């Protein structure tokens, strides 16, 4: 007797993630599930798809990211990444939670219902990230626990407050326990940690990390028992340095992540498909690269029947014509071929900017006979170098120039104050840039060499309700982000176009080869080495305390 199924896929080279090879075989799909891999004479399909000799892989999975870094809502983000073969992501809504607390998480969950992209949320573990900055909300364990009743919540996101774990902070330990009690798992954030410190994380149950910047760090995490998310984002370009650590013997412990990637970069180079392409270009067997991007990611996140193309697995897949270019795959999610979906953007209520800055506020008194502590940008990385250098001082005040810019972080929720410092690496000849995206508390952050333009940039953020600004001698270019000062209410095509205009405006005052806004956003993140700035001042990661600009 013949059984009727939904789809028969034939004439394809289909990835076998268990034996790390492509087979000339077939798939039989019924509703959202793969019924059988191989030839069957007793099955009949309502629909047949001839792959034309193309390559079929499981839907690609992003192991760790922040949707907000794309400046898009979850539903709009889905429209951007699904055409790249992405069918599932693990998102930490830390950014919007830092601004709007529980209501921010609820907003992300609700908006995600408008996209066929499978979005698993990891609950933000550290809001605020440390006690060294003011955020728009504080989330304790009791605020997060109810979310574990939501199927789309997969665990606790990157635990980044190492001192809280090491000192057995009761609230942090409760957050970890609540995740484990709910049958979920806990992601790590182990930037700059020693092997001894990694052991502290592992011993409380943290089992993944995405902060490796090179092969040595990746192997340290592997030896400690972590699953490693190989990061390749807009600023965090770590993959090439990590690839030498991956072998046939250990590949099952690696998956890919973008962490923070702009919509512009996703459209132009790709998402996880770019990570796969980069791995293949650097000598990795395509079967291994795609397995890392699919099955390994599902396993790291404790998902069953996800990430493989065989009997009983969910029918998420991508069809590529060849493995050399990985261009515009045909994508199936849950047994349905993807077509562009419609969505409606809703506002996030009760979000406004509450800060004030004047030129006298951002003046930086210094002694001309003393060196100053400098935040030194590391291009394409979110870490910085802490240097001590002579800087220009006139009449007792720091004077910014193309080498040394001024950087300011202003608390934007309750007008509690601001920090002022010096940053090297933006190479601005004039003007200023400003943003309401400043990890992780998302206060107002401004960098510039012209105080008038810096204040104008701050005032402009007020006027547009949050976003990103370039000011050049009074000429203003903006990208409004009305949803929490983090996300646009526009289609991704419009956001990309406006972002390109913003970058063009910045190119008129600087020639740096990296994304200035994403780089700027991480200059306020004190849990990443080495020297950062918050609304409370300069923060030394090694001392894990504040320091003054001059000793």
Swiss-Prot record:
Q: Where is the signal peptide?
A: none
Keyword annotations: Hydrolase, Manganese
Q: Kind of enzyme, top EC level? A: hydrolase
Checking InterPro entries in the record gives: Adenine_deam, Adenine_deam_C, Amidohydro-rel, Metal-dep_hydrolase_composite, Metal_Hydrolase
Gene3D superfamilies registered for this protein in UniProt = Metal-dependent hydrolases, Urease, subunit C, domain 1
Q: Which domain of life is it from?
A: Bacteria
Reactions catalysed, as given in the entry: adenine + H2O + H(+) = hypoxanthine + NH4(+)
Q: Look up the record and give one Gene Ontology term from the biological process aspect.
A: adenine catabolic process
User: Is Electron transport set as a keyword in this record?
Assistant: no
What family is this protein classified in?
A: Belongs to the metallo-dependent hydrolases superfamily. Adenine deaminase family.
Q: Which NCBIfam families match?
A: ade
Protein name (database record) = Adenine deaminase
Instruction: Output the lineage of the source organism.
Output: Bacteria, Bacillati, Bacillota, Bacilli, Lactobacillales
Q: Which gene encodes it?
A: ade
């Amino acid at each position: 007797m013949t059984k009727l199924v939904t789809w028969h896929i034939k004439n394809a080279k289909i990835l076998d993630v268990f034996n790390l090879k492509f087979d000339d075989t077939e798939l039989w799909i019924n509703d959202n599930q793969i019924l059988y891999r191989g030839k069957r004479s007793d099955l009949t399909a309502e629909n047949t798809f001839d792959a034309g000799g193309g390559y079929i892989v499981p839907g690609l999975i992003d192991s760790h990211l922040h949707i907000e870094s794309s400046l898009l809502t979850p539903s709009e983000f889905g429209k951007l990444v699904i055409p790249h073969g992405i069918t599932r992501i693990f998102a930490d809504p830390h950014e919007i939670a830092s601004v709007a607390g529980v209501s921010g998480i609820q907003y992300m969950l609700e908006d995600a219902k408008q996209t066929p992209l499978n979005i698993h949320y990891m609950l933000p573990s550290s809001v605020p990230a440390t006690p060294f900055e003011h955020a728009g909300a504080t989330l304790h364990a009791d605020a997060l626990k109810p979310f574990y009743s939501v199927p789309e919540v997969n665990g606790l996101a990157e635990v980044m407050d190492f001192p809280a774990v090491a000192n057995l902070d009761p609230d942090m330990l409760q957050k970890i326990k609540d995740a484990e009690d709910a049958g979920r798992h806990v992601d790590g954030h182990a930037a700059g940690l020693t092997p001894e410190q990694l052991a502290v994380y592992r011993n409380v149950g943290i089992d993944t990390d995405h902060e490796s910047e090179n092969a040595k760090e990746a192997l340290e995490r592997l030896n400690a028992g972590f699953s490693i998310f190989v990061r390749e984002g807009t600023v965090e370009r770590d993959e090439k340095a990590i690839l030498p650590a991956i072998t046939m013997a250990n590949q099952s412990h690696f998956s890919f992540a973008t962490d923070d990637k702009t919509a512009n970069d996703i459209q132009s180079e790709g998402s996880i498909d770019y990570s796969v392409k980069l791995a293949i270009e650097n000598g990795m067997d395509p079967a291994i690269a795609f397995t890392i991007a699919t099955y390994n990611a599902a396993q790291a996140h404790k998902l069953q029947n996800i990430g493989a193309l065989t009997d009983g697995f969910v029918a998420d897949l991508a069809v590529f014509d060849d493995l050399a270019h990985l261009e515009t795959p045909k994508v199936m999610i849950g047994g349905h071929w993807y077509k562009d979906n419609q969505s409606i953007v809703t506002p996030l209520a009760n979000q406004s900017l509450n800060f004030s800055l004047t030129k006298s506020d951002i003046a930086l008194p210094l002694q001309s006979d003393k060196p100053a502590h400098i935040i030194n940008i590391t291009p394409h990385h979110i870490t910085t170098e802490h240097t001590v250098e002579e800087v220009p001082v006139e009449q007792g005040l720091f004077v910014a120039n193309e080498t040394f810019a001024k950087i300011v972080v202003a608390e934007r929720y309750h007008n509690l104050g601001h920090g002022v410092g010096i940053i090297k690496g933006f190479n601005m000849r004039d003007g200023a840039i400003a943003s309401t995206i400043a990890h992780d508390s998302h206060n107002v952050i401004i960098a510039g060499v012209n105080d008038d333009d810096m204040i104008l940039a701050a005032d402009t953020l007020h006027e547009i309700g949050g976003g990103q600004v370039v000011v050049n001698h009074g000429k203003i270019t903006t990208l409004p982000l009305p949803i929490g000062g983090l996300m646009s209410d526009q289609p991704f095509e419009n956001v990309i176009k406006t972002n390109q205009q913003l970058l063009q405006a910045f190119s008129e005052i600087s020639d740096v080869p990296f994304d200035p806004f994403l780089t700027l956003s991480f200059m306020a993140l004190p849990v990443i080495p080495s020297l950062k700035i918050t609304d409370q001042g300069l923060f030394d990661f090694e001392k894990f305390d504040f320091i003054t600009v001059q000793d």
